């Protein structure tokens, strides 16, 4: 019998290889030929699944986002009250596997400003990224449901902005940002945001009571 090929799985495999190639050689150095060679395919076989390098990059972005989503949501299902710090750490380059993902991510950011299609894709990715982290925030800090929409948005975007900045710093300066230091800085940011949100909420209640 002829071998049954799982084309979706093969596309994911190629996208994962592209992620590693971009992380190692940069966006410009990740040619179709280099990606095909790293995947063990001919360029003709690669073209059967993707028309252009940009299509591979977009597939890799979707794959990384899906994997981050899985890592952040599976622990939530396993525990009644997950720890926000532990979940958010899953998005940082704290080991070789996640460092590769993050190196790809930061390389992609460098292309967004000059490519209209990638800019549109980045807008979609950012919305999905916010959605994933919003779910984490709701699971870990149930009290945030009592916050105003503006406050939830501010806390959420502050977290994501911090993680993006920390990711870029850790990818660019690996020796200066070992995993322990990344986690410690993230812990401090989470604590500061939580304290600010709780203090702001108490102040709001006090003002409302005074007005009554």
Can you say where each PLM-predicted feature lies in the sequence?
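Short, Lys/Arg-enriched anionic-surface-contact patches
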Residues: 3-10
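Helix-turn-helix
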Residues: 13, 17-55, 59
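Short loop-to-helix capping motifs
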Residues: 52, 111-116
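Short, basic, alpha-helical segments at the C-terminal edge of helix-turn-helix-like DNA-binding modules
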Residues: 62-67
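Amphipathic alpha-helical packing segments from all-alpha helical-bundle domains
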Residues: 74-75, 97-106, 116-142, 157, ...
């Amino acid at each position: 019998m002829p071998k049954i090929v799982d084309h979706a799985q093969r596309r994911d495999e190629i996208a994962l290889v592209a992620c590693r190639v971009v992380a190692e050689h940069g966006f410009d150095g990740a040619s179709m030929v280099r990606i095909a060679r790293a995947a063990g395919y001919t360029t003709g076989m690669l073209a059967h699944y993707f028309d252009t390098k940009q299509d591979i990059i977009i597939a890799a972005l979707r794959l990384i986002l899906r994997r981050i989503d899985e890592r952040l949501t599976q622990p939530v299902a396993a525990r009644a009250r997950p720890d926000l710090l532990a979940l958010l750490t899953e998005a940082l380059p704290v080991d070789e596997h996640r460092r590769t993902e993050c190196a790809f991510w930061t390389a992609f950011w460098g292309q967004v400003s000059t490519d209209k299609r990638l800019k549109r894709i980045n807008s979609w990715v950012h919305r999905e990224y916010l959605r994933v982290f919003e779910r984490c925030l709701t699971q870990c800090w149930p009290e945030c449901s009592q916050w105003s929409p503006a406050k939830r948005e501010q806390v959420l975007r502050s977290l994501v902005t911090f993680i993006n900045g920390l990711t870029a710093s850790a990818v660019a300066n690996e020796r200066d940002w070992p995993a322990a230091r990344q986690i410690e800085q993230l812990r401090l940011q989470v604590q500061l945001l939580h304290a600010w949100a709780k203090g702001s909420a108490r102040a709001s209640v006090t003002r409302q009571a005074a007005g009554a």
